[in-house]
């Protein structure tokens, strides 16, 4: 009888272990991706998704809005509407889009985006000497972040700071070499070859937070913070998803590999968009 009980317990334990392994494997592979057909605007350099829809920049530095994606992040859209020439990088916020002017390194903002006018009004000059913009997903753009031309992270806050011999609301958040910055539901993250998370920003990225925590000392080229998810692109082009992210461990504990040959990624809600090294676009259901 004792042997029989032990056998049953061992059998149940092995079944449970098997089911847990299957569940873990399923979770690690629980995404689907669609590679968009090449169109007349191909190849692309950047893509961004947010409340104001999907926007992309091609290698001719033209900025486009993806038709049918405003307020509907799960929609892949059906075509592109041209918006602006001479654009280097774009990031989507809430009814606003920020982009970098390629020639002058100046930051511009497109306001007035709505369901009835998804491409918004005329671009407005916002700031000088900018190489990267991370827009706030709130209506208030003062919670956005940017990287200036000396590779330093600045956050747009309510405080007034003295910077570059003039008064501004852009305040230093990190003083060393930075490549990309992102702010979303999983907090504020940056790539500095290494990957770093700003403590105290999980669930509320619109705060200045605390110290920077090195999450991975490996080499990364891009990162995107979403709601409970962080996606990143390693320098070798591998798109990875951060695992183990919780309120008590916001920097997570590991990685799951997703796709190879990528250069950029952006996530919002339950989906993500990515660009590969050939300039092809990918729509990803997470």
UniProtKB/Swiss-Prot annotation:
Keywords: Disulfide bond, Enterotoxin, Glycoprotein, Hemagglutinin, Lectin, Lipoprotein, Membrane, Neurotoxin, Secreted, Signal, Storage protein, Target cell membrane, Target membrane, Toxin. Residues 1-30 form the signal peptide. The keyword Transferase does not apply. InterPro entries: Beta-propeller_rpt_TECPR, Tectonin_beta-propeller. It is found in: Secreted; Target cell membrane. Glycans are attached at residue 101. Belongs to the tectonin family. This is Perivitellin-2 31 kDa subunit. It comes from Pomacea canaliculata (Golden apple snail).
């Amino acid at each position: 009888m004792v042997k029989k009980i032990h056998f049953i317990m061992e059998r149940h334990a092995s079944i449970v272990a098997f089911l847990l392994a299957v569940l873990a494997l399923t979770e690690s592979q629980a995404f689907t991706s669609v590679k968009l057909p090449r169109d007349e605007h191909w190849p692309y350099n950047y893509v961004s998704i947010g409340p104001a829809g999907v926007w992309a920049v091609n290698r001719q530095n033209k900025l486009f809005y993806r038709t049918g994606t405003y307020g509907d992040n799960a929609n892949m859209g059906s075509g592109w509407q041209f918006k602006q020439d001479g654009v280097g990088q774009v990031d989507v916020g809430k009814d606003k889009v920020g982009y970098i002017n390629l020639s002058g390194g100046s930051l511009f903002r497109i306001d007035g985006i709505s369901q009835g006018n998804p491409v918004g009004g005329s671009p407005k000059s916002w700031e000088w000497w900018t190489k990267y913009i991370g827009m706030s997903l709130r209506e208030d753009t003062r919670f956005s972040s940017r990287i200036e031309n000396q590779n330093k992270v600045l956050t747009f806050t309510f405080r007034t700071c003295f910077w570059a011999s003039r008064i501004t609301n852009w305040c230093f958040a990190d003083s060393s070499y930075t490549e990309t910055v992102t702010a979303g539901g999983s907090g504020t993250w940056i790539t500095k070859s290494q990957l770093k998370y700003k403590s105290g920003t999980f669930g509320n990225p619109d705060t200045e937070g605390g110290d920077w925590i090195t999450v991975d000392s490996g080499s990364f080229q891009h990162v995107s913070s979403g709601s409970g998810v962080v996606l990143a692109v390693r320098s070798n082009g591998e798109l990875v998803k951060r695992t183990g992210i919780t309120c008590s461990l916001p920097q997570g504990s590991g990685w799951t590999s997703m796709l190879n040959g990528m250069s950029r990624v952006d996530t919002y809600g339950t989906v993500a968009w990515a660009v590969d090294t050939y300039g092809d676009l990918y729509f990803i259901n997470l």
